[in-house]
């Protein structure tokens, strides 16, 4: 389990409704459900990740957050979590506005782009590194 999951869980009260945008394989949702009795729902673009969530019994919708968040009603969740995903959006400002509309509060975590290895890879190769915590290329 990622250390980040514990930090996010500490920010969320028990027994709340949480939307995890860019939920990946559902690991964070599963952790929040088990540890905090949180009612979770995910939104994920990748079909394989959606299938993993379904296999784990987690409620997930396949969709693109940039084009489909408008379908969620205002204040329909207590919290919205956006974990390690913001950097992948073409229009992050619009995504954040939608998250603030959907949830009463929003928790956002981003990769540490100041880490020297990340900066060196960007400088010398012009690309973001692929790691265990950021396995997707973009």
Report the location of each language-model feature.
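A short SAM/SAH-binding and catalytic strip from SAM-dependent methyltransferases
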Residues: 79-91
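A short acidic, Gly/Pro-enriched loop at the edge of an enzyme's catalytic core
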Residues: 71-79
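Conserved alpha-helix/loop element of class I SAM-dependent methyltransferases that forms part
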Residues: 1-15
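Alpha-helix C-terminal capping/helix-to-coil transition sites in glycosyltransferase folds
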Residues: 14, 75-76, 102
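Class I SAM-dependent methyltransferase "Motif I" SAM/SAH-binding loop
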Residues: 22-24
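S-adenosyl-L-methionine-dependent methyltransferase catalytic module, highlighting the catalytic core
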Residues: 93-101, 105-138
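Class I SAM-dependent methyltransferase SAM/SAH-binding core
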Residues: 27, 31-68
